[in-house]
């Protein structure tokens, strides 16, 4: 797939500006007025010299200061209007793009997050969007204002002496060729620089998020080396971009200087031959000099523009991702919780070996089924199919006899609760973490009842602010067992008929595990439960144990029956309890 053109990217960016067209139009008017005052300055000096200093017209000289003041007042007002209006549009553009990106992230399937590092996504939201703003607003300010300025000055030069001005136009094709070559180079370098910023963000995100592991295992030097490598790589690409731009700008300016030198030489000859006035010569020369500043800005804006367009490529690549497919039409208000897997198979993208193969399993309402197997056997993958984090490649999954693909995603997931060892808590109060999402309007009494059932009320009461206690990023102010019980309270409050427990009691001390296990027993009552556990002692009381190996079911039965079979489960059990 070919890369989008600059015109296409800029057109899409301007589409986000369209809702704010009034402020945008106001800024354009201000820019045009500001630019229009530029050629007025040399135009004022021609009659000043010819009429005031040569012809000694005192009446005209007295008007010149007033005209100059009026000119700069007009320029100042127009500049304020354009600057403020464009900044307003730019800030709205940043907000709208970030909102669109975040909304898209919330709608993307799980596989997208599995395939894209969080650091890259954070960099796109935080860094790339501001780069795009430079492209859509700041660059546009320069392009409009300075293009109008250049056109105005060129028009004035044509009016003064069209023959001399033709020299300027003769060098335009060469200038455009240089701009085209530089644009391609700058876009590629800007794209690489932004990718490196994403890598840098990823290193920081991992090192900060895993700071305890880093410190405990003495990984500081390794992480510092990773960061320095990423930072140096980002610096190298940035310097390549700067070097390309540093070469490109002087080349453009040298071309302009050639034109200026030729014009000055010819104009000086005309002045000595009395074919032009002093005022005409000074005005022409002054207008030529005034061309330098906007031309320099126009050549420099290409670097800024290409950085923004390179950033917009990554942003629109995200926005163009297909949202999670929701093929369902049914919204069952109540379900019994009967699950059935019918010849289910799944192969992850880019993998040759299937993660699951021909899985057939019936689970009765209220039954607790434990999924057991070595790492990579397919336990978590199988559980992830129930809420449709992934869809199977083959076969189907039924809920109360209905293919889950026929149930709306929101409705399906509304009937499922999840508690895992990787508890996700938000930097908010305990109450808001428990009454989360669809349960946001739960009453204090309902929240308290869920906390009591989860064996969490005692430690919550001991906190200074109770349920209003802020728990920090991912619940960092809570112990591991407390975090688990908050997650269980959240699941109890949801009161979903299907429950998935993914390693919910691993990595806990004995006291915490006792509390969590008691809370889980309360949670599992009258619910269809899938339990994933490496610690076989935690699932001995399951109604049924399903043993997976290589993505296939190799054994199924109760704990005692499977031990008596002396099969794969007995081997896993013996191996674990011999350690």
From Swiss-Prot:
Domain ABC transporter: 339-575
Pfam family, one: ABC_tran
Chain sites annotated for binding ATP: 373-380
Subcellular compartments: Cell inner membrane
Database matches in PROSITE patterns: ABC_TM1F, ABC_TRANSPORTER_1, ABC_TRANSPORTER_2, MSBA
Enzyme class: translocase
Domain ABC transmembrane type-1 stretches: 25-307
Enzyme Commission designation: 7.5.2.6
Membrane topology: Multi-pass membrane protein
Entry superkingdom: Bacteria
Membrane-spanning segments: 24-44, 63-83, 150-170, 251-271, 275-295
GO molecular function: ABC-type oligopeptide transporter activity; ATP binding; ATP hydrolysis activity; ATPase-coupled lipid transmembrane transporter activity
Matches recorded under InterPro entries: AAA+_ATPase, ABC1_TM_dom, ABC1_TM_sf, ABC_transporter-like_ATP-bd, ABC_transporter-like_CS, ABC_transpr_lipidA, P-loop_NTPase, Type_1_exporter
Keywords: ATP-binding, Cell inner membrane, Cell membrane, Lipid transport, Membrane, Nucleotide-binding, Translocase, Transmembrane, Transmembrane helix, Transport
Catalytic reactions on record: ATP + H2O + lipid A-core oligosaccharideSide 1 = ADP + phosphate + lipid A-core oligosaccharideSide 2
Residue stretches in coiled coil: none
GO cellular component entries: plasma membrane
Assembly: Homodimer.
Recorded family membership: Belongs to the ABC transporter superfamily. Lipid exporter (TC 3.A.1.106) family.
Function per UniProt: Involved in lipopolysaccharide (LPS) biosynthesis. Translocates lipid A-core from the inner to the outer leaflet of the inner membrane. Transmembrane domains (TMD) form a pore in the inner membrane and the ATP-binding domain (NBD) is responsible for energy generation.
Entry remark concerning the domains of this protein: In MsbA the ATP-binding domain (NBD) and the transmembrane domain (TMD) are fused.
Protein name as annotated: ATP-dependent lipid A-core flippase
Protein species of origin: Thiobacillus denitrificans (strain ATCC 25259 / T1)
Gene (UniProt): msbA
């Amino acid at each position: 797939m070919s890369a989008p053109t600059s015109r296409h990217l800029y057109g899409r960016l301007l589409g986000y500006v369209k809702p704010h067209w009034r402020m945008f139009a106001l800024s354009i008017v201000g820019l045009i007025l500001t630019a229009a005052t530029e050629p007025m300055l040399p135009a004022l000096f021609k009659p000043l010299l010819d009429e005031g200093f040569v012809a000694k017209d005192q009446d005209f000289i007295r008007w010149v200061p007033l005209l100059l003041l009026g000119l700069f007042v007009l320029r100042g007002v127009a500049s304020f209007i354009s600057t403020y209006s464009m900044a307003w549009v730019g800030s709205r553009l940043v907000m709208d793009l970030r909102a669109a990106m975040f909304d898209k992230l919330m709608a993307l399937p799980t596989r997208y997050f599995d395939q894209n590092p969080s650091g890259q996504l954070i960099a796109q939201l935080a860094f790339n969007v501001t780069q795009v703003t430079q492209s859509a607003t700041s660059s546009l300010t320069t392009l409009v204002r300075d293009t109008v300025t250049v056109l105005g000055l060129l028009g004035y030069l044509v009016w003064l002496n069209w023959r001399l001005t033709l020299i300027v136009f003769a060098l335009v094709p060469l200038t455009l060729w240089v701009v085209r070559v530089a644009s391609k180079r700058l876009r590629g370098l800007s794209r690489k620089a932004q990718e490196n910023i994403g890598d840098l963000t990823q290193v920081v995100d991992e090192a900060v998020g895993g700071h305890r592991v880093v410190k405990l295992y003495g990984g500081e030097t390794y992480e510092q080396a990773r960061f320095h490598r990423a930072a140096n790589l980002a610096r190298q690409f940035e310097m390549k971009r700067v070097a390309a731009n540093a070469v490109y700008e002087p080349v453009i300016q040298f071309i302009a200087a050639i034109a200026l030198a030729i014009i000055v030489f010819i104009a000086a000859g005309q002045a000595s031959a009395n074919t032009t006035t002093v005022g005409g010569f000074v005005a022409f020369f002054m207008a030529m000099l005034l061309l330098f500043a906007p031309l320099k800005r126009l050549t420099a804006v290409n670097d800024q523009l290409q950085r923004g367009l390179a950033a917009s490529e990554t942003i629109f690549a995200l926005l163009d991702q297909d949202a999670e497919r929701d093929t369902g039409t049914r919204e069952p208000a109540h379900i019994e919780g009967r699950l059935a897997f019918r010849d289910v198979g799944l192969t992850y993208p880019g993998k040759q070996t299937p993660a699951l193969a021909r899985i057939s399993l019936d689970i009765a309402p209220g039954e607790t089924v434990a999924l057991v197997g070595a790492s990579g056997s397919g336990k978590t993958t199988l559980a992830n199919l129930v809420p449709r984090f992934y869809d199977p490649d083959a076969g189907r999954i039924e809920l109360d006899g209905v293919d889950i693909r026929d149930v709306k995603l929101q409705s399906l997931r509304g009937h499922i609760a999840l508690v895992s060892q990787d508890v996700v808590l938000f930097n908010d109060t305990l109450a808001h973490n428990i009454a989360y999402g669809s349960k946001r309007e739960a009453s204090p009494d309902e929240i308290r009842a869920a906390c009591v059932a989860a064996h969490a009320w005692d430690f919550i009461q001991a906190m200074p602010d109770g349920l209003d206690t802020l728990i920090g990023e991912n619940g960092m102010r809570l112990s591991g067992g407390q975090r688990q019980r908050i997650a269980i309270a959240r699941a109890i409050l949801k009161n979903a008929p299907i429950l998935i427990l993914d390693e919910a009691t691993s990595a806990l001390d004995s006291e915490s595990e006792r509390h969590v296990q008691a809370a889980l027993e309360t949670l599992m009552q009258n619910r269809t439960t899938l339990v994933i556990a490496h610690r076989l002692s935690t699932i001995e009381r399951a109604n049924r144990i399903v043993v997976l190996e290589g993505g296939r079911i190799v054994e199924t039965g109760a704990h005692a029956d499977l031990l008596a079979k002396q099969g794969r489960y007995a081997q896993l059990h013996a191996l674990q309890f011999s350690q």
